[in-house]
Amino acid sequence: MNRPIVIAAGGTGGHFFPAEAVATVLAERGHDLVLMTDARHGRRETGLFKDRPQYVLDGAGVAGKGLSGKVHGVLALLRGMMEARRILASLDAAAVVGFGGYPSIPPLTASRLLPSAKRPQMVIHEGNAVLGQANAFLSRFSPLIATSYAKVARLPENARTTLTGMPVREGIEALFGHVYAPPEDRINLLVWGGSLGARVFSEIVPQALAALSEDFRKRLKVTQQIKADDLERVRAIYENAGIEVEAAPFFTNVPACLKNAHLVIGRAGGSSVAELAMAGLPSILVPLPIAASDEQGANGQALVDAGAAWMIRQPDFTAAALTALLTDLFSHPEKLENAAKAAHLCARPHAAAKVADLIESALRS
């Protein structure tokens, strides 16, 4: 039996989907895989890892708020670390690969507590333009670091980095090279807000679209990710405005949604930005305002600087501001086409294979 590779990833889509993409490549290359995560992501029960060993660590995903919450979070992470050390010792793992988020801290830290002869190789992937808090903590162990951006803020001076890009799901990778056709009659607008939608988009976007000219409203087809408790209200706004809409809390056909879209409105998480670039799509980005170190702002700025996107900070994200921007873009489809070309140039295809290559190079060292 081969010594397994342990994949450590938080249960949110931004951490889990890149991990699954890399794991898929490793599995195709014949590696045995083990997942260490938290309990948040249901896909661990249905996707690649369904029939592979999984460990949901005690304390993984507990960040804590307030003094008592932080103390509880630290204690939970310590419990998870001890649990991970026991599991890693029994597995005799060849490598531990982290994809960010607090759930990656226990297994990767625990790997450094093993005797040197049993210590697995350590690789982390950073999906943002700013080194995340978990990866910043783990970087003190001098792991190999795969980056999604050529420039990553907060990296240690002696960091051993390799630019790989952000691994995306196979169906989205297949969109690379898709030729963008600017809207002529129908305008397909995709609105997504992270793993489970974002309430700010449910509040602002319908109002902004309802204020568009009648001509644009008749031409619009909106596909929007909306929290379940907002569905009825938002659908009513679109219906009253005469706008066709497909709304749901979660879309399983994301590649098809991207392929059909003329413009995307959404957050600027690492996975989202990479998927927009891979699909070659123009976008309006509203970075998550509470993201630590403003990594979403840095991610989005990379597309803005390339001419591939427009960014509106959430305090400035009003219905009036969005209506004005959309009116300009829909009136000048060549702006959307130019942004789509720029987005395509930002894409880094085959990132999952490149991360897998880095892991295998570590195994050979």
Curated annotation (Swiss-Prot):
Pfam families: Glyco_tran_28_C, Glyco_transf_28. This is UDP-N-acetylglucosamine--N-acetylmuramyl-(pentapeptide) pyrophosphoryl-undecaprenol N-acetylglucosamine transferase. Its EC number is 2.4.1.227. Pathway: Cell wall biogenesis; peptidoglycan biosynthesis. InterPro entries: GlcNAc_MurG, Glyco_trans_28_C, GlycoTrans_28_N. Keywords: Cell cycle, Cell division, Cell inner membrane, Cell membrane, Cell shape, Cell wall biogenesis/degradation, Glycosyltransferase, Membrane, Peptidoglycan synthesis, Transferase. GO terms for cellular component: plasma membrane. The gene is murG. It is a peripheral membrane protein. GO terms for biological process: carbohydrate metabolic process; cell division; cell wall organization; lipid glycosylation; peptidoglycan biosynthetic process; regulation of cell shape.
